[in-house]
Amino acid sequence: MAARRKPAVLTGFAPIGDSRATLLILGSMPGAASLAAHQYYAHPRNAFWPMLEAVWGIPAALDYATRVRAVVAARIAIWDVLASCQRASSLDADIEHGSIVVNDFEGFFRRHPQISMIAFNGSTAQLLYRRHVMPSLPTELRQIPALRMPSTSPAHAALSLQRKVQRWRELRRAVPAAST
């Protein structure tokens, strides 16, 4: 019987956003399609870019570099909780917990002092942040308001795109400075 091979270590991306960002949207870890394309939310069935179009008016049909510039102009930052991990598939459930390395959030918040809201793109991002990031943050950084939003992943199709957009619009109203 052959020994089961451990999945390769996957490494995420640098954050999108500049020091003017007021909203941080956090995922867990890029999926296989995103890693292959070197783009956040690259899976064609992920609703992230259509949601941003519906809520912030950033056209999903734009090329990736133009969308990124529009996100930055809207004072939005995009990142993931995990810097690296081992995962056998694109599913969050397949993340090997002993392999988790989180991003440097204290450094990120120091470089992005206007962040006034964190939006978790799904429950796994929220759980990973609470479990692996919050305990190491200074008190003032633990107090940044945070909301769990419906995941835009195609693996989470319990809500329609219309309902997801409705929830994300509620977030936009809570962070009025994050606008185009």
State where each predicted segment sits.
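A general structural motif
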Residues: 20-21, 114-115, 143
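Internal catalytic-core helix/loop-beta-alpha segment
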Residues: 73-128
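Hydrophobic packing residues within well-ordered alpha-helices of enzyme cores
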Residues: 52, 128-129
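Short, hydrophobic/glycine-enriched beta-strand segments
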Residues: 22-28
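Short, solvent-exposed loop/turn segments at secondary-structure junctions
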Residues: 30-33, 47, 83-87, 123-127, ...
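C-terminal capping/extension of enzyme domains
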Residues: 1-18, 43-44, 91-103, 130-180
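Short, surface-exposed acidic-centric catalytic microdomains
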Residues: 33-96
